[in-house]
Amino acid sequence: MTPFTEGIILLCIGIFGLAGNLLSIPYFLRRRPGQKTFYTLFIYLSVCDIIVVIIGMLLFGVPKVSEKYAEETFLIIAPYILPTFEIGSTGGIYFTMAICIERYLVVCRPFWYREKAIKSTIYTIPIVCFSVLYNIPRFFELKTVIDYGPVYNDTNKYLSAKDKTFEITADFDEKMENVSIYSIEATAMRLNVAYYGIYHIGCAIIFQFIIPLLVLIVGNVMILKQLLKDSRGSSPMCSDGARGRFSPQVTQHRRRKSQIGRTRVTLAICGIFTACHLFKWVLNIYELYVRYNLSEKETEQLLNDSVWFETVVSISNTLVVLNSSINFYVYLLKICWMA
């Protein structure tokens, strides 16, 4: 598959996802106040998904279909939008975890949940603050460098960051004076071995792999066990909307059915999230293994000059954008299926 085709596919996924996420915000704002926490978390997840989708298209889609954009605009904005992409991605990970935790409390600890009357701010404020603070160092990792000078016939100028993250070839048919040539270079902080090992590998594996995976696995297993018990009628699930009073039998049955529906949506979203982020997690673990078991030269060859590694990275980026594009559609499909 050519890079142009890959870019078109990612852009189509992104446009489809952007439309869904933009529609999801007014949709969830109109939901019943009894499930305010669940829908508020979904709204924040949609905002994070919008950030990931828009910037994902600018980073991984548009450069593959527009040479002019890739040679100038991309190289100017990449050092700033790449950290913003990571903020949205981190927020998406932790809001998915928050939705899973909220469903666990509603399903497995309904009376405690109703008694404590937990509000959405308990989740949203820490997640937003953590997502921003955790990714602040990324704003100081890359910089755009502009070179000025004449360019002659048949001259190919190869530009790349010091870590070979970005590269560009500029071809000119005739002599041109004072041409601006853009490139991206890694800063001294980004090139620091200790910083890269601790932040990019160690922290990424802990905060973006181990913790999310454990929370999602444990939370979903507990939810599934409780749903199985509930389906046998041994432990009726209480609604988070029925705080402080018990509803009539029919109303309670409807609320219980609605809760089960939202819980199944959560299980589906968590499963899709895990599948779409699996490539990213595998890449982090593989990079950790390579950097600590091979020489520097072998590491550079495997990570920067390997076609298969670039292909896996491209697939990983596409899957991350895909995950941020389909959450609302999963919710709608589940609601339609229940109806």
Residue ranges and their predicted role:
Residues 215-221, 264, 268-285, 308-339:
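Seventh transmembrane helix
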Residues 42, 47-48, 157-194, 225-282, ...:
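Intracellular effector-coupling site of seven-transmembrane GPCRs
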Residues 13-17, 44-56, 86, 90, ...:
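Alpha-helical transmembrane segments of multi-pass membrane proteins
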